[in-house]
Curated annotation (Swiss-Prot):
Main localization (coarse): cytoplasm
Subunit structure: Component of the small ribosomal subunit. Mature ribosomes consist of a small (40S) and a large (60S) subunit. The 40S subunit contains about 33 different proteins and 1 molecule of RNA (18S). The 60S subunit contains about 49 different proteins and 3 molecules of RNA (25S, 5.8S and 5S).
Family stated for the protein in its record: Belongs to the eukaryotic ribosomal protein eS1 family.
Statement: the UniProt record of this protein carries the keyword Acetylation: yes
Subcellular localization: Cytoplasm
Designated name of the protein: Small ribosomal subunit protein eS1
PROSITE patterns with a match to the protein in the record: RIBOSOMAL_S3AE
Any GO BP: translation
Keyword line: Acetylation, Cytoplasm, Ribonucleoprotein, Ribosomal protein
Organism: Postia placenta (strain ATCC 44394 / Madison 698-R) (Brown rot fungus)
């Protein structure tokens, strides 16, 4: 008789399974708060692992970037093609306070602007705001027919393209360097910079569909908690009052 393991007796031990733990039981939901320049403040929720040991949930949340449509931020469906990036800079309780981190157009909007028989003109420039943010702004514009034009093509000459691009540089630099980040974001939404470029280029070649279609933050100043709270419309008065106490000289002891 061959000596060996009886396979029939060991069959019952194979069916042991590990207990499955739902990973969501170890996570918490946090509310994302948009700056006060937007109409809607509660823009969504984000998920993070709970604080345990040396790992803090707040550290995992800080620096997280979320992308939200401007239609959701301002309750305006006409602005659905603009995407706003917000960066979580501070966590207070279950609220994540964010700041503007970038803006871009959706790809379908950009593709819808490009048409035949016209010239596309692009420009980008690095500019610093008054509060120390270094941004790169990207502008785009298209030529259009003059009022009395019969020809269907609206191609601009190379010299005209250079002049229009120079106007784009000057206007973007002037508009961005004369205001802080909050005021600059408020210029993006009604497309105030695009209208200025369109007006300035009228004497060179008429333009249409002029937009600042992208904005990137290249460098941010040192984090300031009071400025972030001011951006969210919260109280920043944390300075205490100095306590003045009359000094009394101790009496001299006759014996120790």
């Amino acid at each position: 008789m061959a000596v060996g393991k009886n396979k029939r007796l060991s069959k019952g031990k194979k069916g042991i399974k590990k207990k499955v733990v739902d990973p969501f039981t170890r996570k918490d939901w946090y509310d994302i708060k948009a700056p006060s320049i937007f109409e809607k403040r509660n823009v969504g929720k984000t998920l993070v692992n709970r604080s345990s040991g040396l790992k803090n949930a707040n550290d995992s949340l800080k620096g997280r970037i979320v992308e939200i449509s401007l239609a959701d931020l301002n309750n305006d469906e006409e602005q659905a093609f603009r995407k706003i990036k917000l960066r979580i800079d501070e966590v207070q309780g279950k609220n994540c306070l964010t700041n503007f981190h970038g803006m871009s157009f959706s790809s379908d909007k950009l593709r819808s602007l490009v048409r035949k028989w016209q010239t596309l003109i692009e420009a980008h420039v690095d500019v610093k705001t008054t509060d120390g943010y270094l941004l790169r702004l990207f502008a785009i514009g298209f030529t259009k027919r003059r009022p009395t034009q019969v020809r269907k093509t609206t191609y601009a000459q190379s010299s005209q393209i250079r002049q229009i691009r120079q106007k784009m540089f000057e206007i973007m630099t002037r508009e961005a360097s004369s205001c802080d980040l909050k005021e600059l974001v408020q210029k993006f939404i009604p497309e105030a910079i695009g209208r200025e470029i369109e007006k300035a280029a009228r004497g060179i070649y008429p333009l249409q569909n002029v937009f600042v279609h992208k904005a990137k933050i290249l460098k941010a100043p040192k984090f300031d908690m009071s400025k972030l709270l001011e951006l969210h419309g919260e109280s920043t008065d944390e300075t205490g009052t100095r306590v003045v106490k009359d000094f009394k000289e101790p009496e001299i002891l006759e014996s120790v």
